[in-house]
Amino acid sequence: MTKLILAPEVQAAFANGQPVVALESTVISHGLPYPHNREIALQLEATVRAGGAVPATIAVIQGQVHVGLTNEQIEHFATATDVLKLSRRDIGYAVAAGRDGATTVAATMAIAELAGIQVFATGGIGGVHRGARDTWDVSADLGELGKSSVLVVCAGAKSILDLPATLEVLETYGVPVVGYTTEELPAFYSAHSGLQLGRRVDDPTQAAAAWAAHRLYGGGSGMVLAVPPPVEKALDPQFVEAAIGRAIAQAEAAGIRGAAVTPFLLSAMARETEGESIATNTALLNNNAQVAAQVAVALFQSV
């Protein structure tokens, strides 16, 4: 039997049949600077609770897989400098080596499914990197979506990626991407990508119904619920694209590769947008947590 350490709040939720929403920990250790990372982690948990669900931030601590963190553990991840960034492939190593590890989308999905959590809120999924024809840099998040039965509530894929190619790979893996109040794929910082989805839901009940039906007939894959960033914080697509171009040039000049690419680009985006990207990231994370809680509650009520 897989050993998971459930926080008391999460244990109680399972025992009482309450809805639970998974949250990742990479945003704490690798996504945002301190103390902003700690504040957003606590805010996301508060948002999930306010929406009627129980938050379960997932991480590996000294080789033990935790589903739900204390405030002290969140503080540790916000300040520690030796935290591994974990995809699915890295979980076993971190456990065996007794290391601390922050979970990416892929690792969070894998552990959430083991724990029996159906809904997961994050900022944006990984995908096919620009220039992947040369580098073969494709996020493990996409493969995980193809095999883990978890609903991922996000603002689409991160806009630093090749969004059309990312959609193609998700289609290949049998992963539906459903727009929430939109028929267009959000581009993380921007509401518009120009990529039509052809699948739309307009409220938590519809989203829960779509997910429940996919669970029955989708062959075990996950689903992406793509939520546009809040209108008041969404950035102009042309402004974002120009900043991305400069950030990618910096990454190439610095020889950044592999798992370090996304954190580097997000940090460069913050500099290039003079902090606007961080404000948008924070707003969409909170918005996604709110939607995820509402969908989790709707799922619970439909049972």
Swiss-Prot record:
Gene3D superfamilies: Indigoidine synthase domain (3.40.1790.10). InterPro entries: Indigdn_synthA-like, PsuG. Keywords: Glycosidase, Hydrolase, Lyase, Manganese, Metal-binding. Its cofactor is Mn(2+). Binds 1 Mn(2+) ion per subunit. GO terms for molecular function: hydrolase activity, acting on glycosyl bonds; metal ion binding; pseudouridylate synthase activity. The keyword Cell wall biogenesis/degradation does not apply. Substrate binds at K85, V105, S139, A140, D141. GO terms for biological process: nucleobase catabolic process. GO terms for cellular component: cytoplasm. It catalyses: D-ribose 5-phosphate + uracil = psi-UMP + H2O. It holds the Pfam family Indigoidine_A. Belongs to the pseudouridine-5'-phosphate glycosidase family. This is Pseudouridine-5'-phosphate glycosidase. It comes from Herpetosiphon aurantiacus (strain ATCC 23779 / DSM 785 / 114-95).
